[in-house]
């Protein structure tokens, strides 16, 4: 299918499956905020323009007061959650995260969708405890769910080339498997267009499909295309994915991952119009208004959206807009 020129036919098949899984003509969005608590990282991924090494003049670790302010601003805008991630800081043990999460939960009623698989592995290593114990302790401290970041392409041949210091494929899967077994829901992602082959993408999708069959713990799948500006990988990947490539990939992902209920169409990397079209290529969710986003924006993504922008693009595509929470529950009166 990746080699097919029948874009409309592939899109129609994906839309047919989307209608089967979501028969009420609803498309969803969320109001939340990305909070990047630190940009210090030891991984130096070639596709990332966000990280700074420890000791760099632009390196930071946000104090609680800054994070609290960001959370309050999110709540004031009608937000329901924060997506909190950072670099792999070499000096922050699990106690630092436990204290932060507990203090947030004591002060705010908000969903904590926090820490990627590489971050959890980093915390486990620093703290000298198992992955399962790390997740259990973080869950007990206030972690509600885990984002799917750090997957990139789940094939070690690709990972060695673009992120050789980051966790390998099996390690990423092991974090999500452990989380699901502990009752913690997670999302799955794919960053494509970084020089991988079609076979690499299919391998990635098959691994996610197999894990979902095993655990049922993924709430959603979010694919996005590599943004090359200001990244070292951008010197080798000369062209970013086109809108046609995005829509075809989105549709194929929807068809392949028929056991993951929700698939997000991205406006952050592709813009609002392509995102809107994606609702007819298998997507049922348009993501967040993104009150704050620092990672892909530093790699060249420059799109922005308000809540009304997202509601309008959903209505204009023929769907009923519904605000959801991080776990894809739509109990809001809108």
Label each residue range with its predicted role.
Residues 1-2, 31-34, 86-90, 192-195, ...:
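Conserved short loop/turn motifs at secondary-structure junctions
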Residues 3, 16-23, 50, 76, ...:
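Generic secondary-structure signature for well-ordered alpha-helical cores
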Residues 11-54, 59-85:
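N-terminal pre-triad scaffold of radical SAM enzymes
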Residues 39-41, 49, 78, 149-150, ...:
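Short, small-residue-rich loop/turn micro-motifs
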Residues 52-203, 207-210:
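Conserved Radical SAM active-site core
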